[in-house]
Structures are given as C-alpha cells and as structure tokens.
Regions:
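Conserved S-adenosyl-L-methionine
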Residues: 87-92, 185-189
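Adenosine-phosphate binding glycine-rich loop
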Residues: 166, 170-227
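Phosphate/diphosphate ligand-binding glycine-rich loop within oxidoreductases
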Residues: 1-60
C-alpha cells in the first residue's frame, strides 16, 4: 500500500474495515469508513461525511449542543450525521423514516440509544410529515431532489417550519435543490449540501497531506463540474 491515503465509497465502506489497524470512534459507531490514511504502513480509517456536515453547520454559526434535531431519512448519510450530532452534545434527535422491511430507522435508533448519551426517537414517515414545534435544526438526509429529479421536494409540511429553525440539505447535485430554493423564498435559514461535500473532501486532503486546501477553489471546481 504505497498511497498516502484513499477515499472509498459503497460497497467498500464496510468491507475495508477488517483490513485497517485503527478506526475512529465515530466510524466505529457509523459502521463505515470513507477515508483511509497510511502512516508508515499503519492504516487508519475515519468517516468524514458527518464531520463535513458539522463543519457546514458551524460555518453558519450553528452550535448543536443542546439542540433538538429532526433527521429526514435513515440511510448512510443520516447515520453518519446522527452519530456526529450525538457526540457533539445534541439534546434530542428524531429520525423520520418510511415504515417497512427496509426501514433503517430502528437500527439507527438502537445505535444512538445504546452507544451514545443522546435522547432519540423514531417517527414513521407516512403522508406529509409535520416538523414538531420546538425543533431547532431540520436535516434532509434523503436523496429526494438529487439530480436528475431536480424538481422533487421531500414530503414534509413546509408550513410547519418557523423562522428560528435552520434547515440543512445533504444533496450536492444540484448545488441548489428545489427545497433550498423554496426555503430561501420563504425566508427560512438553510444551507446546501455542497458545503458538506466540500468540507469532507477538505478534511480528507488535510489528513493525507497535513495541509488545509483552499475550499474556495474546491467550490468553484464543483460548480463547474455540475454546470
């Protein structure tokens, strides 16, 4: 293994873990790694998806400690995000997922309840979901709105959002989803998924090289690639 490090994605995020010498706490909880660092032949695995998400919140002045958070979706992105939110001191996490045999909400809830100190619950996503009053942060961790279905918006009640809530999308393509456009039209504070993508990539580069990359250049490259 002569590379300084690599990124990996599905289906290798889980399979590669057995070959690593050390795995970060969050990656162990998530059950997947997306980056590997080679230090003198010792392989270290981490998951920077959730960390990139947290950096996106921080860049908007959002501190998750003590906050009540609703996560739309229970897949891989939701798992990484929920673990980082729990480790950062979120007060309450509500996982909203479709009921059925493929529902990953219960297994994610079990991880949060047994391996972190966060208060958490699941809600079945049946029909139009209403965001509970008192929610601080809403996260769209679904793929609804991802290219090419650029006009789609997750089925939740936009009127249940208030101006003191913050909404974070995880979809990077398009860089401004139909959901983000509608939220901005309504005056709801929000952030696109591009920040999460750029931040996790920047973290990976820094882990491999010890240098912080210019994220402005990375944003520009992403916009050009998706234009």
């Amino acid at each position: 293994f002569k590379m300084r490090g690599i990124n990996c994605t599905i289906p290798h995020k889980i399979a590669v873990m057995q070959y690593l010498d050390e795995i970060s706490e969050s990656a162990q909880l998530i059950g997947a790694v997306n980056t590997i660092v080679n230090t003198d032949g010792r392989l270290y695995g981490d998951n920077t998806d959730g960390k990139g998400f947290m950096m996106s919140l921080e860049s908007n002045g959002i501190d998750v400690k003590g906050k009540r958070i609703v996560i739309l979706g229970a897949g891989g992105a939701a798992r990484a995000i929920c673990v980082e939110l729990a480790l950062a001191g979120a007060a309450h996490i509500t996982i909203v997922s479709r009921p059925g045999p493929k529902n990953l909400g219960p297994s994610l809830l079990e991880i949060l309840q047994t391996r972190t100190s966060v208060d958490a619950e699941t809600n079945d996503w049946v029909g139009t979901y209403k965001i509970p009053a008192g929610t601080d942060i809403v996260v769209n961790a679904t793929s609804v709105g991802l290219y090419p279905s650029v006009d789609a918006i997750p089925n939740f009640d936009l009127d249940s959002l208030t101006r003191d809530m913050f909404v974070q999308d995880v979809i990077p393509n398009p860089t401004e989803t139909a959901l983000i456009k509608e939220l901005r039209r309504r005056g709801i504070r929000c952030e696109t998924g591009a920040g999460m993508l750029i931040n996790q990539a920047a973290l990976n580069i820094e882990m491999w090289t010890g240098r912080k990359p210019d994220k402005t250049v990375m944003y520009r490259a992403l916009e050009e690639a998706l234009a």
